[in-house]
Amino acid sequence: PSVQDAAAQLTADVKKDLRDSWKVLGSDKKGDGMALMTTLFNDHQETIAYFKRMGDVSQGMANSKLRGHSITLMYALQNFIDQLDSTDDLICVVEKFAVNHITRKISGAEFGKINGPMKKVLASKNFGDKYANAWAKLVGVVQAAL
């Protein structure tokens, strides 16, 4: 789908679920960002190859480059949440975010591997499938930009 078509999937209910779950996820950006990244690496070990510049990602919090990426990821998500009321602005920030992934040759399919870890992190915060599905729709907007 086009980025516009993917963004059109973000209904009022989906946006509410994103915002409600972000209130919890966004309250510990470093911890939850690290949880997302380490779960991604554990569940999809092949993705570690995209992060070679970070060195040994198995060091977790002790790896400052991984910590930095995790925090940056969470602020990107914050930016997406902040733009939910303006599809045009959301698409602008998503396309800017996508550039960083395109230069690293990360496809939409590869990027979509974050959905499983996101579902697990959400579940650890007592957010069920409805919320994971909302995040998958937002990830779908990024995938469409890749």
Curated annotation (Swiss-Prot):
PROSITE patterns xref list: GLOBIN
GO molecular function per UniProt: heme binding; metal ion binding; oxygen binding; oxygen carrier activity
Residue ranges occupied by any Globin domain in the UniProt entry: 9-146
Protein keywords: Heme, Iron, Metal-binding, Oxygen transport, Transport
InterPro entries (alphabetical): Globin (IPR000971), Globin-like_OT (IPR050532), Globin-like_sf (IPR009050), Globin/Proto (IPR012292), Mb-like_M (IPR044399)
SUPFAM superfamilies according to UniProt: Globin-like
Annotated positions binding heme b: 101
Family as reported in the entry's similarity comment: Belongs to the globin family.
Subunit and partners: Homodimer.
Designated name of the protein: Globin-2B
Species this chain originates from: Anadara trapezia (Sydney cockle)
Lineage, broadest ranks: Eukaryota, Metazoa, Spiralia, Lophotrochozoa, Mollusca
